[in-house]
């Protein structure tokens, strides 16, 4: 899953559970030096995060980057709004998605790629409770089937 030169730092596992993700985009983040050091240590929480489009630019909200211990006066607000860097064509595509009813921009994962902090941004529709239950039931049945197949394989040997 991890490509060459890519190190995963934070993954939002809840995103695929809460949203039906239709498309993903890779975005850079505008960060301060102490934030980068803190992210490299894995001190970032993207579970509650979301992105918004303001003046044809995309901003990341509600993502917590813990202050760097040795950063003292250079540390910024942990929950500050951060700008995301995408190509204009990608931003236009995202604007088109978000203008449709119910679409949300969700941070999927944060990773290092060739020394740069990148964010995988997912475009999705929120799932209803019954959709989540169906997905859980489907996963449980798949696990049961795999378990049965594994036991049969062991019995034949």
Curated annotation (Swiss-Prot):
Compartment(s) where it occurs, according to its Swiss-Prot or TrEMBL record: Cytoplasm
GO CC terms: cytosol
GO terms, biological process: trans-translation
Listed name of the protein: SsrA-binding protein
Region (Disordered): 130-157
Pfam families cross-referenced by the UniProt entry: SmpB
Function: Required for rescue of stalled ribosomes mediated by trans-translation. Binds to transfer-messenger RNA (tmRNA), required for stable association of tmRNA with ribosomes. tmRNA and SmpB together mimic tRNA shape, replacing the anticodon stem-loop with SmpB. tmRNA is encoded by the ssrA gene; the 2 termini fold to resemble tRNA(Ala) and it encodes a 'tag peptide', a short internal open reading frame. During trans-translation Ala-aminoacylated tmRNA acts like a tRNA, entering the A-site of stalled ribosomes, displacing the stalled mRNA.
Cross-referenced InterPro entries: SmpB, SsrA-bd_prot, SsrA-bd_prot_CS
Predominant subcellular localization, coarse grouping: cytoplasm
GO molecular function per UniProt: RNA binding
Basic and acidic residues bias spans: 132-157
Organism, scientific name: Alkaliphilus metalliredigens (strain QYMF)
NCBIfam families: PRK05422.1, smpB
PANTHER family, sorted: SSRA-BINDING PROTEIN, TMRNA-BINDING COMPONENT OF TRANS-TRANSLATION TAGGING COMPLEX
Xref: HAMAP family: SmpB
Alphabetical UniProt keywords: Cytoplasm, RNA-binding
Entry similarity comment: Belongs to the SmpB family.
């Amino acid at each position: 899953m991890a490509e060459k030169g890519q190190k995963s730092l934070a993954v939002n596992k809840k995103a695929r559970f809460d949203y039906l993700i239709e498309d993903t985009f890779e975005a850079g983040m505008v960060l301060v030096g102490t934030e980068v050091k803190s992210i490299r240590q894995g001190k970032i929480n993207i579970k509650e995060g979301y992105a918004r489009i303001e003046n044809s630019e995309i901003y990341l909200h509600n993502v917590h980057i813990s202050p760097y211990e040795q950063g003292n006066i250079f540390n910024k607000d942990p929950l500050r709004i951060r700008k995301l860097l995408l190509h204009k064509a990608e931003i236009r595509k995202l604007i088109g998605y978000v203008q449709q009813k119910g679409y949300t921009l969700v941070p999927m994962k944060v990773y290092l790629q060739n020394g740069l902090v990148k964010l995988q941004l997912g475009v999705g529709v929120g799932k209803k409770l019954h959709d989540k239950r169906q997905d859980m039931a489907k996963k449980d049945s798949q696990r049961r089937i795999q378990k049965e197949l594994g036991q049969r394989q062991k019995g034949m040997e």
